[in-house]
Amino acid sequence: MVPEVLIILGSGSDLKIAKRTMDILEELQISYGLKIASAHRTHEKVKNVVIKGTEVGIKVFIGVAGLAAHLPGVIASFTHRPVIAVPVDVSLSGLDSLLAAVQTQFPASVATVGINRGDNAGILAAEILGIDDENIRTNLSKLRESHRNKVYCSEEEILSEIRGSYFKNFELNQNIEDKDNFSSVSKMDNSFDVDHMDNNLNSFVDVAVILDSYLNIKVAETILEILNKLDISHDFKITSPIANPIEFSDHINRMKDVKLFVGIGGSSAVITGSIVALIETVVIGVPCSNQLNGLDALLSMVNMPPGVPVATVGIDSGENAALLIGRILGIHDKKIETDLKGEIDNERVFKEI
């Protein structure tokens, strides 16, 4: 029997992280398998496992590795299916494995989650499979609800223990009027007329691409060009959860029925965290190098708390984000899968970009 998800460990010592993934998949009733194969010490085994797994119908691969964590990228080089990377903290607080996984070269696109976040890898795999499976989506909603309830319960417990003389419990007993801050920023950003971009607020598309600032328009253009090549329908909008929070949330609500979102942002990249807080489907994050060479944006995108993963690609790597979209949607769409395989197999992947 073929599992839907295959977890590949670079070493047996990574099992403790993989158990977090397996626990989530068990809870969500998703079939999975497990192999141990090192990208460096048993390269042929990785190759054979991935090629055979793809042939027999595995839909999602998860690579778990530490140190120079090249395993997820090697997996991606042998399959057109989506690959999720879980960097493991073995040394340098896991930063070495995080960078090795997320900065994978095009076209071996990898969806990276936070360091040691095996649980988020399981949730991301479920979100990918849930695009075409209502039962998985229902189970995911229940899981997200349990995470929300934990937050409310923890507040009640902590407040009940506070005995300060000046402590006053602030009750939320009225609705807060919706009001955007810095509305002039919204007018400035949305005044740009970008040729060839779909900006019709069309909720009947497959992908919603959201850019937080015109500063990163080149990254967005790369994504949109490749989506056009793969004939994947998409919407594009420039809006910020910081400058225009109400406009932003309204837009997410309008687009809630799309199959996946892409958030593009720099600095403290709040955009992807804001998207994933409002919806329960796949969110791909593209960090941009506005400051600190993009390291600030990368870390604020990828290291999400339990329950809310962001499928993060490399810094300024719009091309890998677009290819990851193709890998994900190709599971559910034969034409996209065929087009994607042809481009990769012929080593002609978007050579004009």
Regions found by a protein language model. Name each.
Residues V2-E4, L28-S31, V56-K59, T79-P82, ...:
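Short coil/turn connectors at secondary-structure junctions
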Residues V2-R41, D198-P241:
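Glycine-rich phosphate/diphosphate-binding loop of Rossmann-like nucleotide-binding domains
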Residues P3, L9-D14, R20, G94-F204, ...:
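C-terminal binding/interaction regions
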Residues L9, I36, A65, V86-D89, ...:
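Short beta->alpha connector loops at strand-helix junctions that form conserved
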Residues D14-K19, H43-K45, A65-V74, L92-L95, ...:
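Short glycine/serine/threonine-rich phosphate/pyrophosphate-binding segments
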Residues T21-E27, V50-I51, S77-H80, E127-I128, ...:
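Short, solvent-exposed amphipathic alpha-helical segments in soluble enzyme
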Residues E44, N48-P87, S249-P287:
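Glycine-rich phosphate-binding loop
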Residues L67, F78-F106, L278-P306:
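Glycine/small-residue-rich loop that forms an oxyanion/phosphate-binding "nest" at active or ligand-binding sites
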